[in-house]
UniProtKB/Swiss-Prot annotation:
Organism encoding this protein: Novosphingobium aromaticivorans (strain ATCC 700278 / DSM 12444 / CCUG 56034 / CIP 105152 / NBRC 16084 / F199)
Role according to the record: Required for accurate and efficient protein synthesis under certain stress conditions. May act as a fidelity factor of the translation reaction, by catalyzing a one-codon backward translocation of tRNAs on improperly translocated ribosomes. Back-translocation proceeds from a post-translocation (POST) complex to a pre-translocation (PRE) complex, thus giving elongation factor G a second chance to translocate the tRNAs correctly. Binds to ribosomes in a GTP-dependent manner.
Gene name of this polypeptide: lepA
This protein's record includes keyword Hydrolase: yes
Keywords on record: Cell inner membrane, Cell membrane, GTP-binding, Hydrolase, Membrane, Nucleotide-binding, Protein biosynthesis
EC primary class: hydrolase
GO MF, one example: guanosine tetraphosphate binding
Gene3D superfamilies for this protein: 3.30.70.240, Elongation factor 4, C-terminal domain, Elongation Factor G (Translational Gtpase), domain 3, P-loop containing nucleotide triphosphate hydrolases, Translation factors
Listed PANTHER family: TRANSLATION FACTOR GUF1 HOMOLOG, CHLOROPLASTIC, TRANSLATION FACTOR GUF1-RELATED
Record-linked InterPro entries: EF-4, EFG_II, EFG_III/V, EFG_V-like, EFTu-like_2, G_TR_CS, LepA_C_sf, LepA_CTD
GO terms for cellular component: plasma membrane
Protein name as annotated: Elongation factor 4
One Pfam family here: GTP_EFTU_D2
Length: 605
């Protein structure tokens, strides 16, 4: 058992690429967590995608032993948290498990938008925040300027910020000393009923679900019968341990400690992040605050390119779900794309990661339909149905427009950091996306803009456009601010007067015409010509808002007539005309798969 005064629980907050995982690697190396030979880049990022993109998706933990200046050995529990907005709830639970945080800022780039969001969460948890200025050995490093920025933007005293270079190992000891001296020890009562917070969980093929816990009060040990208070399930603990970063089995975890437990749980969905774990007998009476069900925000359809891969896709999605309970799916079928799944995600990065893992780990070729958000629709009463409220995930399920009383869509509050010279383009982009500006401040040579935007406009291609107009310099972060009423309509795309379900979308009435025209032009270039004219239309209800026509290929039926009578030619041309009219009525237009994929990738405008 470790004395509470010798425990320090801390997390690392940083924007993508500011050196968070590298700093964690150095701390592990310095405290002897791994030998030189076992050390690899980004030890705590287990997934290939995490390493390649330089992002952290799942929260990871590692226990380090460090002998301080006073000669005592401290137990340091480092939580490596995700930095991206999609995983904001995971971050909030990881932060709630700690008493302090290292704020890592790149000495050359300064404070970025994502750093801010997580710092404010950390401040809400009353954390002691230690600023760490990283990459000080870069030629472009300006530590003094960054210190001033931390003070101006975040309002933290950065006079005693630790200067480090995680890559070359400068200042690592100073970071560890700062953790020991400046971050407070946890509080807890060993004799009280067990109360532990479930910080994260993941699936291990040998152990079942591994659960990361922070013990608040009481003791957790092997053989205990515990219950999850929000989930309501009971389990018998069969292993207790910690990561150093290799798995080490322990007898027990006491108050203030962070470690893992296994209890032969088969699905991650049973172990919900933020839940409270207590004993079945004489357990805690009330759960820890802050638990909430994670709801998917962005939805899209995922279909196999080859219909024969459907079963493989079903198995792969089910396996991914074992490890990621925040991702939901149900079967759907489309006339154009066959069988597939309607999947829900926490945000766009989450969608991209799942899609990439499906294609990479399970070797699947996939088509994803345009992402959409959840709309709340109030329906009027009809002759055979009462007035009611529905949630709409899929544009194909859009109800009869005459019954719709109101439609509400989710809005977000976005914070954008951008260098001055790109400010005009950024403001124009936000206005084009129906944004409402709520603030504009200048920090050094950069502007911080806050906008309220409909999430529907952001999921489409907002992030890519923002990066391209600012040459990659702008950073963006958002939080949800609830639902608001909007003038939204369903736009259907008709090819040869037949609606194509996979291409229908919900858009704001003001943007419908432009979006419809763009889609029709796109399809005109992609669908091959047939022997008859093909109209492509974008329609809202019965009203066509945009139209393009693919002209017919012409077969020269008069080629076999040599000179002679004009009436013979007229007769043949008349016959051809009738045939084409009949074809137009009964002919099927085959839309090639590539046309679908290209039309759905409208982001490349």
């Amino acid at each position: 058992m470790t004395d509470l005064a010798l425990i320090r629980n801390f997390s690392i907050i940083a924007h993508i690429d500011h050196g968070k995982s590298t700093l964690a690697d150095r701390l592990i190396q310095y405290t002897g967590g791994l030998t030189e030979r076992e050390m690899s880049e980004q030890v705590l990022d287990n997934m290939d995608i995490e390493k390649e993109r330089g992002i952290t998706i799942k929260a990871q933990t590692v226990r380090l032993d460090y002998t301080g200046k006073d000669g005592k050995t401290y137990q340091l529990n480092l939580m490596d948290t995700p930095g991206h907005v999609d995983f904001a709830y995971e971050v909030s639970r990881s932060l709630a498990a700690c008493e302090g945080a290292l704020l890592v800022v790149d000495a050359a780039q300064g404070v970025e938008a994502q750093t801010l969001a997580n710092v404010y969460q950390s401040i809400e948890h009353d954390h002691e925040i230690v600023p760490v200025i990283n990459k000080i050995d870069l030629p472009a490093a300006e530590p003094e300027k960054v210190k001033a920025e931390i003070e101006d933007v975040i309002g933290l005293d950065a006079s005693n910020a630790v200067l480090t270079s995680a890559k070359s190992g400068i200042g690592i000891e100073e970071v560890l000393d700062a953790v020991v001296e400046r971050i407070p020890p946890p509080k807890g009562d060993r004799s009280a009923p067990l109360k532990a917070m479930l910080v994260d969980s993941w699936y291990d093929p040998y152990l079942g679900v591994v659960i990361l816990v922070r013990v608040i009060d009481g003791v957790i040990r092997k053989g205990l019968q515990v219950k999850f208070m929000a989930g309501g399930t009971e389990h018998l603990i069969d292993r207790v341990g910690c990561m150093r970063p290799k798995i080490e089995t322990l007898d027990e975890l006491g108050p203030g400690e962070i470690g893992f437990i296994t209890a032969q749980i088969k699905e991650v969905a049973q172990a919900r992040v933020g839940d409270t774990i207590t004993t079945v007998k004489q357990g805690a009476s009330e759960a820890l605050p802050g638990f909430k069900e994670v709801q998917p925000v962005v939805f899209c359809g995922i279909f196999p390119v080859d219909a024969a891969d459907f079963e493989k896709l079903r198995e792969s999605i089910a396996k991914l779900r074992l490890n990621d309970a925040s991702f939901s799916f149900e079967m759907e079928s489309s006339a154009a794309l066959g069988f597939g799944f309607r999947c829900g995600f926490l945000g766009l990065l989450h969608l991209e990661i799942i899609q990439e893992r499906l294609s990479r780990e399970y070797d699947l070729d996939l088509i994803t339909t345009a992402p959409s958000v959840v709309y709340r629709i109030q329906l009027r009463a009809s002759r055979n149905d009462d007035a009611r409220e529905i949630l709409l995930h899929n544009p194909a399920d859009y109800p009869d427009p005459s019954r719709i009383e109101t439609i509400e869509e989710p809005w977000i509050k976005g914070t954008i950091y951008t260098p001055d010279e790109y400010l005009g383009s950024v403001l124009k982009l936000c206005q084009d996306r129906r944004g409402i500006q709520t603030g504009l401040t200048y920090v050094g040579g950069r502007a911080q803009v806050t906008y309220e935007l409909p999430l529907n406009e952001v999921v489409f291609d907002f992030y890519d456009r923002l990066k391209s107009i600012s040459r990659g310099y702008a950073s963006f972060d958002y939080e949800q601010v609830g639902l608001r009423e909007g003038d939204l309509v369903k736009m259907s795309i008709l090819v040869n007067n037949e609606p194509v379900d996979a291409l229908s979308m919900i858009v704001h009435r003001s943007a419908a015409e432009a979006r419809g025209r763009h889609m029709c032009e796109r399809l005109k270039d992609l669908i091959p010509r047939h022997l008859f004219k093909i109209p492509i239309q974008a329609a809202i209800g019965g009203k066509v808002v945009a139209r393009e026509t693919i002209s017919a290929m012409r077969k020269d039926v008069t080629a076999k007539c040599y000179g002679g009578d004009i009436t013979r030619k007229k007769k043949l041309l008349e016959k051809q005309k009738k045939g084409k009219a009949r074809m137009r009525e009964y002919g099927n237009v085959s839309i090639p798969q590539e046309a679908f994929i290209a039309a759905l990738r409208m982001g490349e405008e």
